[in-house]
């Protein structure tokens, strides 16, 4: 058994995916916590590479959710007239969130229905029990677990941006750790400072942000605008940083 990692929100940054692949050993595994495409430089190619990679197990993110709904509408009502599709509700929502290149890449595929089916089957959460016996829950947006077999609705697992504002409840699972993406670390840090401390000096943002008394960790580095991402080792919690030539070492990210 190799090492087990988590990564999230690559958002079409194919170069970061390629660097991760060079780093991985053949027996390693990566949980990809959603948002493979949209906003970046090689959106559909990144989605294809990750989905076709046996070392990656993918969780559905909100950008996959938007893409799937757009695909469904296209297959049902707009194929083969893509011009009309971009005026539809699902199409315009996806485009507004940086999904134009992702959608056009899919439209050019000859096996569009297969890609739709594969993405539509993605889970909204996964679990991993690490070498120290910690139960690691993973979803795109994050959540607070109260029992091992009870989960919030899929919409919340994919889209929620509220759970990180609250402390770890006394009745939540004590042995649990939640790893997630969705909300870039800088927004979580800024919100928590604003709600708990008033005025503050802007901190240097970490690559992996631990909070809720060490029970939660966000690994969304905003790859499409920071040009960096992190692999988090789920057994040792060691962080491995990857960045493109456009990364600014003087930026406020460690």
Predicted regions and their residues:
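Active-site neighborhood of divalent metal-dependent phosphoester bond hydrolases
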Residues: 43-128, 133-134, 166-167
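Acidic, His/Gly-rich catalytic cores of divalent-metal-dependent hydrolytic chemistry
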Residues: 169-254
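Residue-level marker for buried hydrophobic side chains located in beta-strands
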Residues: 6, 30-32, 58-59, 137, ...
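His/acidic metal-ligating clusters that form di-metal
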Residues: 110-191
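N-terminal active-site segment of His-dependent metallophosphoesterases
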Residues: 1-53
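Active-site-proximal beta-strand elements of phosphoester/diester hydrolases
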Residues: 3-11, 135-142, 217-219
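Active-site environment of divalent metal-dependent phosphoester hydrolases
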Residues: 11-15, 38-41, 64-68, 145-146, ...
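Divalent metal-coordination and catalytic microenvironments
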Residues: 9, 35, 50, 61-62, ...
